[in-house]
């Protein structure tokens, strides 16, 4: 059974000018603040109003939200395999399947799992990131994850994400 929603278009890449990257061995993790709006999606996807309308129609929790995103790339930054969106209204995560535009978005249940920020950092810190990477087509990376590098990166990612979230809360 597949949960969530699959879009056949690639996800929005992070804005490198506003993303801080933390190396973690064979992967790197980007931390970015995002303000997701229909207008931002239209601008990113070249004015494809049909795609934005599909998002409005099919996204169960809407597409206007903001918060911190954690981007999990291969170390060279060629492919974003996973993304954890620590959003205010509709936290969720993505499997961005290697080699295509398949973008699988899964709503996050904070009642069952606690705050998504804690859950996402725990996934990065632990071996539980490996099956998620494999699911997104990164089995080779998953097999080569370095637990020490992940632990160090997880601490840095958690601190930077908390700082961005605090700034977000202060601006509300």
Predicted regions and their residues:
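An exposed acidic His-Trp-rich patch
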Residues: 79-139
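Conserved aromatic-histidine-acidic binding/catalytic patches
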Residues: 58-62, 112, 145
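Short, well-structured hydrophobic secondary-structure segments
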Residues: 59-83
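Short, flexible loop/turn elements at secondary-structure junctions
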Residues: 33-35, 74, 88
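Charge-rich, low-complexity N-terminal segments
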Residues: 1-60
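Generic hydrophobic, helix-prone segments enriched in Leu/Val/Ile
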Residues: 29-31, 120-124, 157, 164
């Amino acid at each position: 059974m597949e949960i969530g929603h699959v879009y056949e278009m690639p996800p929005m890449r992070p804005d490198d000018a506003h993303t801080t990257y933390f190396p973690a061995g064979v992967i790197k993790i980007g931390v970015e603040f995002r303000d997701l709006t229909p207008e931002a999606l239209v601008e990113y996807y070249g004015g494809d109003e049909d795609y934005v309308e599909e998002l409005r129609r099919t996204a169960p929790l809407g597409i206007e939200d903001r918060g911190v995103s954690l981007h999990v790339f291969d170390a060279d930054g060629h492919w974003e395999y996973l993304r954890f969106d620590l959003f205010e209204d509709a936290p969720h995560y993505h499997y961005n399947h290697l080699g295509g535009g398949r973008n699988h978005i899964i709503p996050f249940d904070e009642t069952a799992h606690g705050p998504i920020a804690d859950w996402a950092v725990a996934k990065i810190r632990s071996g539980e990131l490996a099956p998620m990477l494999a699911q997104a087509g990164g089995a080779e990376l998953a097999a080569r994850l370095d637990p020490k590098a992940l632990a160090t990166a997880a601490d840095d990612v958690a601190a930077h994400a908390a700082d961005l979230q605090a700034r977000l809360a202060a601006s509300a």
